[in-house]
A protein has these predicted regions:
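Active-site hotspot residues in diverse enzymes, especially metal/ion-binding acidic/histidine motifs
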Residues: 1-244
Length: 244
């Protein structure tokens, strides 16, 4: 596994640009599957997380309403909050450090795109954020602060809206970096450009819709993820709206 040399802020947050995350994600994707660059296809993201990043994957219900899609555990705990649907009650689970826990609602065929992006996202936390979250242990009244990060389904930071290293709290920046990493691994920058090289380039709505479909079909991602990847790579305008 390629191990990046990262610079960190005092809080333990990586100081890294979106472009450098793209470069790192692509390098890791190619290191894992060297054919992924010049023959664009869906990366086996589950195997990438488990075998390449060496992060075991478990499925548990993280809430009763799917508000949390994934959790990365940084320190072994007996107290990860989970929901037991059979008993309709909350409980705690033992989870080892370095484990990715995916909400059970994503373990369904019609949730494949969301599952794939969530796996990449949690992998991003594993690559970038152990130092940050472990540094926060004991920093609040909550006993579980820093032991794990629970990623909400309603968090959205996309495109260039939060480029660079400004405007975000550390917690928000961690989510943005994990999102960018997931996009970079699932849809490597060079592979996207190779994929779209054969079509006349313009920024019309028709071109955007067609490019989104091609990216979605080729990399097995949602059209929404494809749209924000195009925006993040500045292939469409920052203010462009989803065409559906």
């Amino acid at each position: 596994m390629f191990k990046p040399k990262l610079k960190y802020s005092r809080s333990g947050m990586p100081v890294i640009s979106n472009e450098d995350i793209d470069t790192l994600g692509e390098r890791m994707a190619v290191d894992f599957d060297y054919t992924s660059l010049f023959n664009p296809h869906p990366i086996d993201i589950e195997r990438f997380v488990e075998k390449y990043l060496k992060m075991p994957i478990e499925f548990m219900y993280l809430s009763h309403c799917s508000v949390y899609l994934g959790t990365t555990v940084f320190q072994t705990t007996d107290y990860l909050p989970v929901y037991i649907p059979e008993d309709k009650c909350a409980d705690y689970a033992h989870v080892e450090a370095g484990t990715v826990v995916i909400d059970g609602s994503l373990d369904k065929e019609d949730q494949e795109h969301r599952l794939r992006f969530t796996l990449g996202h949690e992998g991003g936390h594993g690559v970038f954020h152990p130092s940050y979250f472990l540094n926060t242990i004991g920093s609040s009244e909550r006993d579980d602060t820093g032991i794990y990060v629970r990623c909400r389904s309603d968090f959205k930071v996309s495109g260039r809206d939060f480029s660079g290293f400004r405007s975000l709290t550390d917690a928000e920046r961690a989510e943005q970096q994990a999102n960018r990493f997931s996009a970079a691994v699932l849809m490597p920058r060079s592979a996207v450009k190779i994929l779209l090289a054969g079509r006349p380039y313009n920024r019309t709505e028709g071109w955007i819709v067609s490019a989104m479909k091609q990216i979605s079909d080729t990399f097995n991602v949602s059209k929404e993820a494809a749209f924000y990847r195009l925006k993040g790579l500045e292939m469409i305008e920052e203010h462009a709206k989803m065409p559906f």
